[in-house]
């Protein structure tokens, strides 16, 4: 919410439910990508103009000390998460050995990340992003070519004709005649190692407790990394939605993440980011859950924010409208996803049309359109309670 994309494209112009930017670095060159999923019937010319305005805003305002602090905090947490399993440790050590010539470069890498300055950020922007060549891809419904960005060239895409029953005629050997498999040459020994002794499985000890308000606690301690992960489950979820307003629990979860009485959505996000923490709230069929990740030194401050979210919801009207728009866009997207369509159809056959489990998670377009802020408050007051909460 503090990014130039969110402020300009989503909050100010309200052209899209989501926007993101991502950098992918390779050995010789990198790729900086900006992606926006527009609202229905939105011209991609407007999206392009909004992206350019976002970049202009970034160039004019630069990077603040607070921005750099919260991004570094998040990078530090992400770095520790990237070596939190045996597999990820092996992968990272191998990566550093291959590209830096030293598996111990892991300590230098995190030091380099934490030493980045505001000047470094703007230098990279001016050198690699500003006024650079770019490939711009427009993807629109086939029936709405007028939404494509001006001066675009149509890319030829072969559309596969799906014929029911044709798969029975498919020959797995087609095209493989007289093409022996040739292994790629390598200097590494990839032969299967001899089978060693089976490792002993050490089951971590789970401790349990409970709070005076009735919340049950479960935990496992691991001191290898300075990280804490937590999960709070509140029983209920979509099963407790009014029958004609399915999707209420989902929107409640969305709004719980949109500020508190004393913090705007942007201020809450900044408070979380400055700790290098993450807090995610979601609704399922049978529960609403809050999951989080934090540096151990910032756990208490992170849990204070979770408590504030649970006890002092903001009920921001603007955030409510954005959440509804985003939910409706998501429901529309599902219509183009065969797997989701099949899953929803299966649930209707299994449970029957009137059963709560037959309704897609998050509701339908009609039910979401009918939900009001009062509905969210009523659900929250009736169902968010420590007596039905479990903390892991």
Walk through the language-model features, giving the residues of each:
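Short Ser/Thr-interspersed hydrophobic loop/turn segments at strand-loop and sheet-helix junctions
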Residues: 2
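Proteolytic maturation boundary segments
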Residues: 107-233, 377, 387
């Amino acid at each position: 919410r503090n990014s130039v994309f969110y402020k300009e494209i989503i909050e100010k112009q309200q052209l899209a439910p989501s926007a993101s930017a991502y950098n992918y670095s390779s050995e010789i060159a990198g790729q900086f990508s900006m992606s926006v999923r527009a609202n229905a019937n939105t011209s991609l010319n407007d999206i392009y103009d909004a992206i350019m305005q976002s970049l202009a805003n970034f160039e004019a305002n630069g990077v603040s000390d607070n921005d750099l602090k919260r991004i570094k905090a998040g990078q530090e947490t992400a770095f520790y998460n990237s070596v939190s399993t045996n597999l990820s440790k092996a992968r990272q050590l191998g990566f550093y050995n291959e590209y830096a010539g030293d598996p111990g470069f892991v300590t230098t890498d995190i030091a380099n990340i934490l030493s980045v300055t505001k000047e470094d950020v703007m230098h990279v922007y001016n050198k690699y992003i500003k006024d650079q060549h770019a490939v711009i891809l427009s993807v629109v419904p086939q029936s709405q070519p007028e939404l494509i960005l001006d001066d675009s060239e149509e890319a030829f895409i072969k559309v596969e004709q799906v014929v029911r029953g044709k798969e029975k005629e498919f020959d797995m050997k087609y095209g493989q005649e007289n093409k022996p498999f040739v292994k790629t040459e390598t200097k590494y020994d990839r032969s299967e190692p001899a089978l060693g002794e089976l490792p002993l499985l050490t089951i971590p000890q789970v401790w349990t407790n409970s709070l005076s308000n009735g919340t049950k606690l479960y935990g496992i301690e691991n001191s290898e990394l300075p990280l804490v992960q937590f999960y709070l489950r509140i029983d209920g979820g979509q099963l407790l939605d009014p029958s004609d307003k399915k999707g209420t629990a989902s929107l409640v979860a969305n709004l719980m993440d949109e500020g508190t009485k004393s913090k705007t959505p942007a201020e809450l996000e900044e408070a979380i980011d400055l700790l290098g923490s993450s807090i995610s709230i979601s609704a399922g069929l049978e529960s609403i859950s809050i999951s989080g990740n934090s540096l151990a030194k910032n756990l208490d401050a992170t849990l204070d924010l979770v408590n504030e979210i649970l006890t002092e919801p903001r009920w921001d009207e603007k955030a409510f409208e954005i959440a509804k728009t985003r939910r409706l866009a998501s429901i529309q997207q599902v219509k183009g996803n065969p797997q989701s369509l099949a899953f929803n159809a299966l649930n209707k056959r299994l449970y029957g049309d009137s059963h709560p489990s037959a309704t897609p998670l998050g509701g339908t377009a009609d039910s979401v359109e009918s939900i009001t802020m009062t509905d969210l408050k009523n659900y929250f007051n009736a169902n968010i309670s420590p007596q039905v909460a479990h903390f892991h």
